[in-house]
């Protein structure tokens, strides 16, 4: 295959022929995947390892971005990250817990009890990362569409 060949991403490979006989079925499938991965991202955000001396913890969000990009591709993955960001900005506690919230659980917090934070991305310490998730998921999705998730290209 040529270097410019397009590959199917994981979601398209697994869901081949599922409710895609019509344009509406395809749109519904895409919307369900976008919402589902916004929820996966909210779950990944709750996996937190607090680092001493910083307000930005290590979270499972990095895994969530990579998973969304590789699974959904460059069109749906950024939309799922954008939806995740908008849900948090609307007041739902889907972002990683603040370091103060993590302190009451020790240095590690794993999903339950739910301690997510919310707020405008430009007013929280991790806001730049959240905006960056949109671009990172697009890059990973594009690489997956080029076949970089199948074999080394070096």
Segments predicted by a language model, with ranges:
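Short helix-perturbing small/polar motifs within transmembrane alpha-helices
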Residues: 2-22, 29, 35, 43, ...
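Hydrophobic transmembrane alpha-helices
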Residues: 2-86, 90
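Gly/Ser/Thr-rich helix-start
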Residues: 70, 74, 78, 89-92, ...
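Glycine/small-residue-rich loop that forms an oxyanion/phosphate-binding "nest" at active or ligand-binding sites
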Residues: 66-71, 84-118
């Amino acid at each position: 295959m040529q270097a410019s060949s397009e590959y199917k991403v994981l979601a398209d490979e697994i869901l081949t022929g599922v409710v895609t006989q019509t344009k509406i079925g395809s749109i519904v499938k895409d919307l369900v995947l976008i919402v589902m991965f916004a929820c996966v991202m909210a779950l990944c955000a709750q996996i937190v390892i607090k680092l001493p001396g910083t307000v930005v913890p290590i979270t499972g969000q990095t895994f969530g971005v990579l998973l969304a990009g590789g699974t959904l591709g460059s069109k749906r993955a950024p939309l799922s990250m954008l939806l995740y960001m908008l849900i948090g900005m609307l007041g739902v506690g889907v972002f990683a817990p603040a370091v103060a919230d993590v302190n009451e659980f020790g240095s590690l917090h794993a999903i339950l009890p739910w301690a997510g934070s919310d707020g405008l991305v430009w007013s929280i310490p991790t806001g730049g990362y959240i905006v960056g998730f949109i671009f990172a998921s697009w890059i990973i999705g594009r690489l997956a569409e080029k076949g970089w998730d199948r074999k080394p290209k070096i």
